[in-house]
Amino acid sequence: MNCYQLLYDGFYDALINAALPVLETDQDAQRAFLRLFLSKNAVVLLDFHRSIEPLIAEAEKGNNYAQYAYARWQCLKRGGENSLNISYRNMLAAAEQNLPDALAGLAMTYEYGDIGTVDWAKADELLDKAYLMGSELAAIYKIKNYLFGRRFLPAQPEKAAELANELIAKQEAEKLEPNGWWYYYRASANEDRIGRTRVIDDYTCALEFGVPEAYADLIIAYGYGDDTKTLVETKEYTHYLNKGIEHLCAGAFFMDAAREMRRYDALEDLYKNEDGVQRHTMRYNMLLQSHNIIFSRLTHAAELVDIAAWEQLGDCYYYGSYGFEKDIQKAFTAYSNGVIHDSVACAEKLWKMMHNHLIDRDLDYVDQVAIWGARWGSRLLLAETVIAHQEGRLTEYDDEITKYYDPIFDAPEFSLDNDEDWAGVLDDILSDEGDPEDDDGRYDAWA
């Protein structure tokens, strides 16, 4: 059975079961198996009994591919309190057997302190070693570091595109089966520079070669073109939206929620100035139906580990928007779920709720959220982490804070008087009333 085709067709459980018995001898099965675990959307869809139980059984026998796969599932799914510890143990076991992707995965545990320890030098060492050994996961991390910036350094999308081009040229020269992620990240790196509509072919190629996340990007490209504000429901937009939902793409569910939110906004004005019980009832029923669709789509996306969906659910409860009942506790829970999955935006909003005593938690937890946010790249929460440390808290993270965060905080370009860094940002994260602030284009990028 062609393992690559199972990957491209989205038959992930079948791929696991086809590849596991032949991983030691079949290089194509190895590569297809490892590529499945490059996609969060694919990994969270794996059936526990059909795929995860066999992986656990093989991991316990010392199979390094199974150890790595089980570690990735635990890391991406995060279904329990011990998920990251289980992930680390299995990733370490696979890395000790020199599986390149496991070395890359281990690098990320040191990069972000998943096991409580941040060590950027160790992360760099492991990532470079994995990359030189041919790890595709390491290559993706290197591209993302250029694409989104790293350790509070600016993004370099042109270098991300350059590396993606090199990887595409290499696979063509070596006549390897295409990796859809190289096309995906080349498109991501180029879309702001040359326009979203000019990278559609790369996103289409990514989808063809096993990147389900590309559904969301194609929905945006065909629906919004090079504009993030005006939706035109073209036949291509509708096609990829429906196909994405059919294939359980988290981003497709989120995009359908975004479309329905626009419809809800329009419905709120419908019949507003007209009298009559019938008109009022019709408007109410239409708004209720729209709210139910928004709730359903956001919930589905969140269950598929879409952090933007957790943030949007939190916003809906926080503001009482789109027919949601205003509920601070539910907002807090939604943001907390986003934090479990490393959402910077959710960490900032959660921290502000506690800072403003909308939800009371002990100061240790408030500080813990701050240092998580600092690790993930929040300039606001880096500042709060350093301030907490200066006030005698977070002493268990002395080395991490003094080595990494103090120098950034003390740099001349990082000023508390600079709106882009800190001043004013706190109020923009969650305003006290009205609609969510579009502080940095996150919402427009999706909606």
Which residues does each predicted region cover?
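Canonical positions in the second alpha-helix
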Residues: V22, E58, A93-A94, A130, ...
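Alpha-helical linker/edge segments of TPR/alpha-solenoid repeat scaffolds
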Residues: K40-F48, R151-F152, D227-K229, L270-Y271, ...
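Structural signature of tandem alpha-helical TPR/SEL1-like repeats
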Residues: G10-D13, V44-E53, E81-N90, T117-L126, ...
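Short helix-capping/linker turns of helical repeat alpha-solenoids
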Residues: T25-Q30, K40, E60-N63, L76-R78, ...
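N-terminal leader/linker segments that initiate helical-solenoid repeat arrays
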Residues: M1-A29, L46
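Hydrophobic face of amphipathic alpha-helices that form TPR/SEL1-like repeat modules
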Residues: R35-N41, A69-L76, G105-Y112, K142-F148, ...
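Intrinsically disordered, low-complexity Ser/Thr- and acidic-rich flexible linkers and loops
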Residues: L176, T228-K229, A266-L288
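DE-rich, low-complexity intrinsically disordered acidic tracts
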Residues: T402-A447
